[in-house]
Amino acid sequence: MQAKASANMVRLAPRKARLVVDLIRGKQVGEALSVLAHTNKAASPVVEKVLKSAIANAEHNYDMNIENLVVTEAYVNEGPTLKRFRPRAMGRASRINKRTSHIHIVVTEK
């Protein structure tokens, strides 16, 4: 049985969020939480929140044992991009892309 959790439209660049998600894929849930707690990246608290949500879903919806949970799938997809403009010299403007991410985590019982 699988338990899933996701966070959509998170204001993090997908490339930076993938660095954090790659650290927890395939690990036990307790180990993954400790890795996230000691990772000094902006995406760590967001990924930790999604992982805790997946754990809560597994426990509440499917009566799974938390000690046996493993992160089987963890991936980040690109969300919509917010486009902003920054004024530059001589009346010009440059476009700034503010990227968003969709973070998905799936846990299963081992």
From Swiss-Prot:
Pfam families listed in its UniProt record: Ribosomal_L22
Keyword RNA-binding assigned: yes
GO molecular function: rRNA binding; structural constituent of ribosome
SUPFAM superfamilies from the UniProt entry: Ribosomal protein L22
GO biological process: translation
Keyword tags: Ribonucleoprotein, Ribosomal protein, RNA-binding, rRNA-binding
InterPro entries linked: Ribosomal_uL22, Ribosomal_uL22_bac/chlpt-type, Ribosomal_uL22_bac/org-type, Ribosomal_uL22_CS, Ribosomal_uL22_sf
The keyword Membrane is assigned to this record: no
A GO CC term assigned to this protein in UniProt: cytosolic large ribosomal subunit
Record's function text: This protein binds specifically to 23S rRNA; its binding is stimulated by other ribosomal proteins, e.g. L4, L17, and L20. It is important during the early stages of 50S assembly. It makes multiple contacts with different domains of the 23S rRNA in the assembled 50S subunit and ribosome.
Family according to the record: Belongs to the universal ribosomal protein uL22 family.
Assembly, per entry: Part of the 50S ribosomal subunit.
NCBIfam families, alphabetized: rplV_bact
Annotated protein name in UniProt: Large ribosomal subunit protein uL22
Source species of the chain: Exiguobacterium sp. (strain ATCC BAA-1283 / AT1b)
